[in-house]
Amino acid sequence: MNKIRLLPLVAASLLSLGTAAQTSFPGAETIRYEAPEGTTHAHQVRSATSFYDPGEGVAYLDSVEYYTADYVEAEDGSVYLSNPFVFFPTDTWLKLDRAGGDTLVARLPQAMFEGDDGTVFYARRMVLSDRGDGELDCLPDETETDVRFTLRGDTLALVDGGLDEQGMPRYILGLATATGGWSCYGEGLTTIVPLRYEPTQKPEGKPEQTIHFVHYNPFIEDDMDEEVPAVCDGDKIYWQLPYSSNSGETYWVVGEWRDNRITVLPQYLGVDTWSCLHLFAMPADYLPESSQLDPFDLKEMLVLNYNPSTETYESAYENQTLLVNVGPDRVYYADSYVTPRLQSLPSTSILSRPRLDTPAPSVCYSPDGRGLRQPTRHGIVLRRNADGTVVKQVAR
């Protein structure tokens, strides 16, 4: 994620009371918790420039990709957009009215969220204002209240005013109170398009068996041995990743067996509906000495070589990684599996005891041509059983 911290970005308060007095603000009873009947476009791909508060009382600006978005085209031609604020899902709907041709208009303010203390937050058109002392305010726009969208073909987009000389959106769709107090959440440069990928799914009619997916966890600095279901289908092996969403979705990845090795390519895993994310399995390298926030570098493939002495498919080199990543284009990961290996493959599969007439070389090569040694990590591992319990054992 490309984060730019605005130091400090101050929420407007009583500065906009004059504007509030001239604007009609609907009550909490007008919040739309459901959309009307119509054509639903679910799990679209949203990209945006988004503001959010990480809990510090200031706003951060972030360009986001591969977040989900839902909208409904109602029978009267209007459009209802769910959760218009990426980092503050309200589970409510913003109404966009037809304004001729492919143009839609969000007539603002619209009530979007009611706080525990009864404070109503509204979708409002807002602008950044330089206070002249090195600080910025985000204030309701005094020249115009509405924002416009276009729906052209299968693309829904916010009509933005471009960027100012500081690279900030000239106006945003913000979440604020009637008095102009900004929540530090808002959207600019929003585009919503259909998803172009199909998720990896296990083949139907094939028996599942349990295998061990072992990997290093850099955050606890230890190995994890996790029992996961797997399905073999010819020269392919499918296994369920340990990552699961709070909504209960599970995700499968597929690798292809050839020349005594398993190759895993980038692939779409599916939607995390709880976090509103599109997830991908992305090969990468872990960079333990890196100081960057996300210490991984995306790669073209992940390779697991067969080790006949342990009957295990092992990572071709240390720190090779499989990421559960948001989108396929940059590192923004939900989970990571460093130096992975597969153990206890189904005995009915050709992968469990492959022919050794074309063995994998003892020295492996990464996509950039570096000679790399086989992994040598041994010792104590953490093993997760099928019932969820975790025990320590000696790696063999």
Model-inferred region functions:
Residues 338-371:
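Residue-level detector of functionally pivotal "anchor" positions at catalytic/ligand-binding pockets or at interdomain
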Residues 22-41, 167-210, 224, 317-347:
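Edge beta-strand at a domain terminus
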Residues 5-11:
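Sec-dependent signal peptide hydrophobic core
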